[in-house]
Structure formats: structure tokens, C-alpha cells
Amino acid sequence: MNFSNRYIYILFAVLVYACTKTPMPPDPPSDSLTDIPYNPVAYTITPPPGFPAMSIPADNPLTVDGIALGRHLFYDPILSADSTKGCFSCHALSGSMTDNLAVSAGIDNINGRRSSMSLLNVGYYYNGLFWDGRSENLEAQALKPVEDPIELHENWDNVEVKLRRHVSYPTMFRKAFGISAKSEITRDLAAKALAQFERTMISSGKSKYDLALTTGTGVEFSDEESYGFSLYNQLETRDGQCGHCHQGFLLTDNVYRNNALDEVADLNGFVDKGRGEVTNILYDNGKFRAPTLRNIALTAPYMHDGRFLTLEQVLDHYATGGHYSDNVDPIMIQLKNNPLTEPEKQAILALLHTMTDTVFVNNPALTSPF
């Protein structure tokens, strides 16, 4: 074999080997996120007139990117097992962050026991969250719906995997919390982001109620609304008893009470034990958090189980003092002994409508980013 033929033979053999060799798999995608800049920008909440500064946890300061991540997670059904529901399903902006249902159904169309509470000003709440106060703070609260079998019916291990594999979330978690790798995306960071977004759900200060109580706005209550305000706050001989539970800038005192919804033979007789399920204290059975009255006209139906469809029905309940049980709130007994008249109910109703904050429910920063 001469040199030319030998050269051709070797070249042919190399080409055959190259074509038949098993190709090497591509390098796996990098878990690292360090090539993405982390430059957190602090976000400052400006409270409306009459509101104090919000207390923010030291381990979860508000940042622009943290809030943006929380907003996406809030409106993303990725948190549910079948990707059909999310936080937004029970907390719609049009209903002041409620769903306007007596009770809410999860992904399996199983109804829960209670109405969704409004998230308006939830960052100011203390003494527990939910109707029964079972979560200490927003970070703890955000973890519960995902694994609740009646709500999103997912588990956080799966959610963490979905978030790590997502096309956008690793970058967003990096920008929000400075993590170095996708594997560092955790449920706790997701809960922190959700809590940051929820802390931005604050009143605008532009309701008629707020403007009428702020000097220099030129807004005044009507005569009927003024009478309702007097009854609400016991500024006259008659006391509507409203301001005892629905007081301060939040229009709630964050206390759990039995407001005489059900009559029971003994304190074990409540179908829904409310606060008692959390504390295991018999005297807490049948007690529920006093909700805020801000945007109350937008959050029907009312009470923890949505039993009252209208505010008129609510006032009728309070006008009669409700039903007796051993731990009924003393205020209800006073109402029973001194019931509201029809003109008094109408005046209080007029005042309640001044608490509607249309600026809040039209805030574009609180809408879905998708």
C-alpha cells in the first residue's frame, strides 16, 4: 500500500469512528444563579393619614423585587396541585381581597367551613390571623393553604420543585433574596415573598369616611351619616355598640368574641368551635375574630360562615342581641336589652357605606401581573 492509499484509508477510518461514536450528552443546566445581579431596593410603605407605620419583621424587609415575586406567586395557580387555583381564588381585589362566597371551594370542589377574610390592611393585624387566629403572622399564614386538602391540596416539596424548574422564578428568587442556586428556593422564601406583597394591601385613605375625618379635605358626612357616626362611637346617649369591637384606624380591635350567632346548651355545642379549636379553652368555643369594617359593603356575605347576605341582615341580628350562650359577649346582652331602632340602623348603615375605599380595589399595583 503506497503512502496515498494509506492516508486515505486512515482518514476513512477516522470518519467512520466519528460517525458511529455515541455522542456525549450536553452539559446539565447550571444550578448556579450567581451570574444574575442581586441589588435589592428597599420598598417603603407610606401609610394614609391616621395610620401608624407598619411593623415589618427584621428578617423579611420589604424590597421591590420581593414584592414583585410575591405578587406573581399570589396570582399563579402553580401553588395548587392541578394548577387551577391560587391565593387569588379566595382573595379577589374587586371584593376587597375576599371571594364574596359564604364558604370557598378548593381544587377538588370541596367546600370549606368558613368565609375568606379580607386581606385589606392585613399587615397591621396582630393577635393571630384567620378567623380563629391559628397563624401567628403572615409568613406562617402563607404556608397553610398550599397543603390544606380542602384548598390547594398540594405539598410544599412539589411546589419547591416546580418553582426551581420554572423558566422565570429562579431569577426572581435570586433578585428578591440573593440566593446563589436554584436549590435554595424554599417554601419559607416563597412565604416571605407572599407576605411582602400582602403587606402592601393597605387602605388608600380616600374613602369618604377617611376624608371626612381628615382636616382640610372639605369632605363632610351627611346628616344621616353623622348620626350614624355618633351612634357608632357613643357620642350621644344612645350607643350602637359598634365602636367597642370595630375601633381605631383598622376598624377592628383584633379580639375574638362570641357575637351571639348560635344558641347552644353548653359550650361544647358549637358546630364550629372557632378560637377554641386553637386554644383548647372551653370558654373560647364559638369565638371568632372581629373583622375590619373597612370596605365592608364590598365583602358580603357576612360572618365567619357567610350566613348573612346583606348588611341589613347583620344590623337586624345586632338589633335583637342574637342568641344566648354562656360565653356570649356582654355587648350583645346590652343590645338585647336596648335594641336599635329602624332609623338608628339606617344611620349606621349609611356610615358603613362611607367606609368603602374604591381607590384600593382599583389599585393597579395589586392586580394580576399575568
Give the label of every model feature segment.
Residues 1-8:
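Bacterial N-terminal signal peptides that target proteins for export
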Residues 17-18:
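C-terminal motif of bacterial Sec signal peptides marking the signal peptidase cleavage site
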Residues 21:
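Short, conserved catalytic or interaction motifs in soluble domains
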Residues 24-144, 207-309, 313-317, 322-327, ...:
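Short glycine/threonine-rich turn/loop motifs
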Residues 83-86, 115, 134, 155, ...:
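Generic hydrophobic, aliphatic-rich segments that mediate packing or membrane embedding
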Residues 149-154:
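A gly/proline- and charged-residue-enriched helix-loop-helix capping module
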Residues 156-175, 179, 183-204, 297, ...:
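C-terminal capping alpha-helices of c-type cytochrome domains
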